[in-house]
C-alpha cells in the first residue's frame, strides 16, 4: 500500500456561511432642460446573494468543507441615478451528499437533505436599500436621502452525513462485514485480516430475486461506542436511517463469547440517541448472521455452531449461518432481508425540493431600562437603524417617523421616560425629545 493515498472520509464538519450585503439606494434628482429639479430618480440597491445547500448524488463526503470552512455570497450592487436599480448579488449553491443533516449552533436540527436535488436556504441575502425615487410620496415629494442596504445573514452550522441504507451490518472489528457486503453487492471495500480495516461506511446495492435494497457496512464497534469510544458516535450515526440491523458474528472466533458480544452491541445500540420520532436502533427488525462457517472443520466446532443457532433463535427470529468466502447461505439470507425491507417502512423521510428556515414569531419590539438607559430591541427597529444614513438629517427624521408609527414613543411615555433620557436602539444612542414635532428623537453620538 506504500505510495497510495486513500481518500479521506469526512462526515461531520462545522461551517460558517455569510450571505451578501444589500446594495445602497441612490439619492439623486432628475435634471432636464428648463427643469433643473425634475424629481427624484435614484434607483434602489440590489439584494445580496443567498446561500443554498443542495443534496447531490455525486457527493459522498464533506471533505470539501474541511478544506474550506467559510462560504460567502456576493453583495448586491448600489442603485444609480436615472432610476437604475442595482444588480442582485449572485446566489451561491453548495453541494452536499444526500443524507446530510444540518444543525444550528444550539444543536437543533434545521433540515435533513435526503432526496437528490433537495435544497436548504441556510442564509438569506441582505435587502437592498430603497432609492429616493421609491421613497417619494405625498409627504416627501423629493427626498434627498436613500436607505442603506442591509447586511446578509451569517450563521455557523454543523453538517453531518448519515448513510442512506435499508440495512446496516454491525458487529465487532474483523467479523467479516466488509467481506459480506462485497459478496452480496458490487461494493469493493478494503478487506484485510486486522481490526479497523474499515474506517468509513461502505454502501452497496443488493439485487436478490424481486428485491432491491441498499446495505451499509458500518465500521467495527467497541464497548462504549454510544459514548464516543473508538469513534463509536461517528459510526453509529450511519445506522440511524436503516430499517434493518444485521448483527454479524464471527462463529470461528474462539477468543470472544459470541452471545455476550451480541448483548454488548445491543446495549450500545439501545443507548444511542436517535431523532425524536425515529425508532430506537435496538427496537428495529434485526437479523443475526453467523459468519465464517467455511473454517469450521471439527465436530466440536460444528456442534458449537448448532448451539449458537439454537441460543440466538430464542432471541431473534431470523438467524443465518453463512460464509462470505464460499457464498454458502447468502441466497436465503439476502432474500429474507429483501422481504423485511419491504415489510418495514424506511427511516428516511423524503424532503421537499426547497426548504426555507422559518422566521421566529417575535413581538415587533420590546422596551426595558438598564443603567438609566431605555433599550429598544426588535427586528424592525434594529433593521431601520442599519438602513439609516446618519449623516443626513432628513434620513434621521424619516427614521423617527417610522419609530413613532411603530409605537415606540407611546411605549416610552408609558414606561415613564422624560425629555432628555437616553434611548438605545441597535447600538445607537438617542436623546428623547417628545416636544419636537414629527421627530421624537435627536441624535446624540
UniProtKB/Swiss-Prot annotation:
InterPro entries: G_OBG, GTP-bd, GTP-bd_Obg/CgtA, GTP-bd_prot_GTP1/OBG_C_sf, GTP1-OBG_CS, GTP1_OBG_dom, GTP1_OBG_dom_sf, OBG_GTPase. One of its GO terms (biological process) is ribosome biogenesis. One of its GO terms (cellular component) is cytoplasm. The gene is obg. Mg(2+) binds at residues 178, 198. PROSITE patterns: G_OBG (PS51710), GTP1_OBG (PS00905), OBG (PS51883), OCT (PS51881). PANTHER family: DEVELOPMENTALLY REGULATED GTP-BINDING PROTEIN-RELATED, MITOCHONDRIAL RIBOSOME-ASSOCIATED GTPASE 2. Residues 357-434 form the OCT domain. Gene3D superfamilies: GTP-binding protein OBG, C-terminal domain (3.30.300.350), GTP1/OBG domain (2.70.210.12), P-loop containing nucleotide triphosphate hydrolases (3.40.50.300). CDD domains: Obg. Residues 7-164 form the Obg domain. It is found in: Cytoplasm. Keywords: Cytoplasm, GTP-binding, Hydrolase, Magnesium, Metal-binding, Nucleotide-binding. Its cofactor is Mg(2+). Coiled coil: none annotated. Monomer. Belongs to the TRAFAC class OBG-HflX-like GTPase superfamily. OBG GTPase family. It comes from the Bacteria. It comes from Tropheryma whipplei (strain Twist) (Whipple's bacillus). One of its GO terms (molecular function) is magnesium ion binding. GTP binds at residues 171-178, 196-200, 217-220, 291-294, 323-325. The keyword Ligase does not apply. Residues 165-342 form the OBG-type G domain. An essential GTPase which binds GTP, GDP and possibly (p)ppGpp with moderate affinity, with high nucleotide exchange rates and a fairly low GTP hydrolysis rate. Plays a role in control of the cell cycle, stress response, ribosome biogenesis and in those bacteria that undergo differentiation, in morphogenesis control. The keyword Flavoprotein does not apply. This is GTPase Obg.
